[in-house]
Amino acid sequence: MITVNVDLGDRAYPIHIGAGLIGRTELFAPHIKGSSVTIVTNTTVDPLYGDALRAALAPLGKRVSTVVLPDGEAYKNWETLNLIFDGLLTDHADRKTTLVALGGGVVGDMTGFAAACYMRGVPFIQVPTTLLSQVDSSVGGKTGINHPLGKNMIGAFYQPQAVIADIGALTTLPDRELAAGVAEVIKTGAIADAEFFDWIEANVEALNRREPAALAHAVKRSCEIKASVVAADEREGGLRAILNFGHTFGHAIEAGLGYGEWLHGEAVGCGMVMAGDLSVRLGLLDEASRQRLDAVIAAAHLPTRAPALGDARYMDLMRVDKKAEAGAIKFILLKRFGDTLITQAPDEAVFATLAQTTR
């Protein structure tokens, strides 16, 4: 087992990475202070790992209940969030009840948001079961739900007590979900660590084959990078925005097609292709680096051509973005691997990128 720490002073927490961790009682025990635990999971994950988690919690002598949500990005909304609150209230959960998010990014984001809101804040633990959630969404305290007009526009910054990333859970992940997680690994290397990006290029096939050593290194290094960024800028006042490379275009794709049509990581992968194209058009990135970026995204079996939503639709969707200010779209662009720029772009350049990268 490897442990990475997120250094946030008195709100610091560990990220435990390894195989077989869901069943390890001692990883949960230090973080559960009250008399009850509510597991939040979904209809796909509960049959796979719910019993193992409940068995791990049993020796603690806590009252354990489970809320099972429908699976998918399409359910990341108020109605599904209320299912969590319904369960907490029905079970008479109190301020010391610990929520445990068992699932991917949707479960983690919604459980964290519920924890932030219920009784104005109860503790929660992340147990991410997808590669995307292990390398990205479970770390850093971003929680929330989608709105029909924009992704993740309603939420809170609320840190977990711990992240327990069991890479053994990745063996049951569908291929599309695995690729979606590799997209976030690629993003992390591209924005923050050129050597890690080199490693990803050399090992993308090992990741595709789910080789445990490759997966463990990808999760570890991604978490190290994200932990350092979050420690420096917890509430996305500046530096943390670089983690949104590929997300301005990607969120527009998700909202434009309807949440769930493309996986989040698929949209981010294609969004990075689009951001790379725009980076070259603005004279920030060299063509050879753009080609390397596109090649590794394609090698991860991610889409590299965006849906043709129309220029006006893309622009409208990108203006409904957390980075936008006074309606001005902000992009995270590459200067070189490991170096980014947060900037606006002329509409003509954005239109040229859309013409080049959409079907």
Curated annotation (Swiss-Prot):
Pathway per the UniProt entry: Metabolic intermediate biosynthesis; chorismate biosynthesis; chorismate from D-erythrose 4-phosphate and phosphoenolpyruvate: step 2/7
Cofactor note: Binds 1 divalent metal cation per subunit. Can use either Co(2+) or Zn(2+).
SUPFAM superfamilies named among the record's database cross-references: Dehydroquinate synthase-like
Species of the source: Burkholderia cenocepacia (strain ATCC BAA-245 / DSM 16553 / LMG 16656 / NCTC 13227 / J2315 / CF5610) (Burkholderia cepacia (strain J2315))
Enzyme class, broadest EC rank: lyase
GO MF terms, alphabetically ordered: 3-dehydroquinate synthase activity; metal ion binding; nucleotide binding
Name of this chain's protein: 3-dehydroquinate synthase
Entry binding sites for NAD(+): 71-76, 105-109, 129-130, 142, 151
A GO-annotated cellular component: cytoplasm
Name of the gene this protein is made from: aroB
Classification of source organism: Bacteria, Pseudomonadati, Pseudomonadota, Betaproteobacteria, Burkholderiales
Positions with a binding annotation for Zn(2+): 184, 247, 264
